[in-house]
Amino acid sequence: MNFTGYSRFLIVFVALVGALVLPSKAQDSPQDYLRVHNQARGAVGVGPMQWDERVAAYARSYAEQLRGNCRLIHSGGPYGENLAWGSGDLSGVSAVNMWVSEKANYNYAANTCNGVCGHYTQVVWRKSVRLGCAKVRCNNGGTIISCNYDPRGNYVNEKPY
């Protein structure tokens, strides 16, 4: 195949645009959210979650309400909820990994946190079996990730698993 200068430029341009655009989308699919949640759950012997479009629709609707100010304010809705914020393009996988990193603060034997661990305990909450997540780019360029859990978890004095 013989490429002209313009053809070579076009091929390189398309490849670069694809390399810049695809990674941000590649870690925001329902399968991506489920994979990282279920890895964390499996590590402590908790069964997998299933994607639930009804729960995801709730997450999308609420995340859209946060687009204007990008503040991490919980919805107070019917589901368990984890929120994450990034100043740029935060992926869903990165958000879930931040929540899972709180495992280091959780003492299962005492069922206590040494620091923040409530996001982690919601991720691994045994009775939460349906998941829905959403990502919204805020007006200020930041990103909000919202994951909702059905049924909700994090009940006082109850271990997650």
From Swiss-Prot:
<dbReference type="InterPro" id="IPR035940">
    <property type="entry name" value="CAP_sf"/>
</dbReference>
<feature type="domain" description="SCP">
    <location>
        <begin position="34"/>
        <end position="149"/>
    </location>
</feature>
<dbReference type="GO" id="GO:0006952">
    <property type="term" value="P:defense response"/>
</dbReference>
<dbReference type="InterPro" id="IPR018244">
    <property type="entry name" value="Allrgn_V5/Tpx1_CS"/>
</dbReference>
<dbReference type="InterPro" id="IPR001283">
    <property type="entry name" value="CRISP-related"/>
</dbReference>
<keyword id="KW-0964">Secreted</keyword>
<feature type="disulfide bond">
    <location>
        <begin position="70"/>
        <end position="138"/>
    </location>
</feature>
<feature type="signal peptide">
    <location>
        <begin position="1"/>
        <end position="26"/>
    </location>
</feature>
<keyword id="KW-0052">Apoplast</keyword>
<feature type="disulfide bond">
    <location>
        <begin position="133"/>
        <end position="147"/>
    </location>
</feature>
<comment type="function">
    <text>Partially responsible for acquired pathogen resistance.</text>
</comment>
<feature type="disulfide bond">
    <location>
        <begin position="113"/>
        <end position="117"/>
    </location>
</feature>
<keyword id="KW-0611">Plant defense</keyword>
<dbReference type="GO" id="GO:0009414">
    <property type="term" value="P:response to water deprivation"/>
</dbReference>
<dbReference type="Pfam" id="PF00188">
    <property type="entry name" value="CAP"/>
</dbReference>
<dbReference type="InterPro" id="IPR014044">
    <property type="entry name" value="CAP_dom"/>
</dbReference>
<comment type="similarity">
    <text>Belongs to the CRISP family.</text>
</comment>
<protein>
    <recommendedName>
        <fullName>Pathogenesis-related protein 1</fullName>
    </recommendedName>
</protein>
<keyword id="KW-1015">Disulfide bond</keyword>
<keyword id="KW-0568">Pathogenesis-related protein</keyword>
<dbReference type="GO" id="GO:0099503">
    <property type="term" value="C:secretory vesicle"/>
</dbReference>
<dbReference type="GO" id="GO:0048046">
    <property type="term" value="C:apoplast"/>
</dbReference>
<dbReference type="GO" id="GO:0009627">
    <property type="term" value="P:systemic acquired resistance"/>
</dbReference>
<dbReference type="GO" id="GO:0010266">
    <property type="term" value="P:response to vitamin B1"/>
</dbReference>
<keyword id="KW-0732">Signal</keyword>
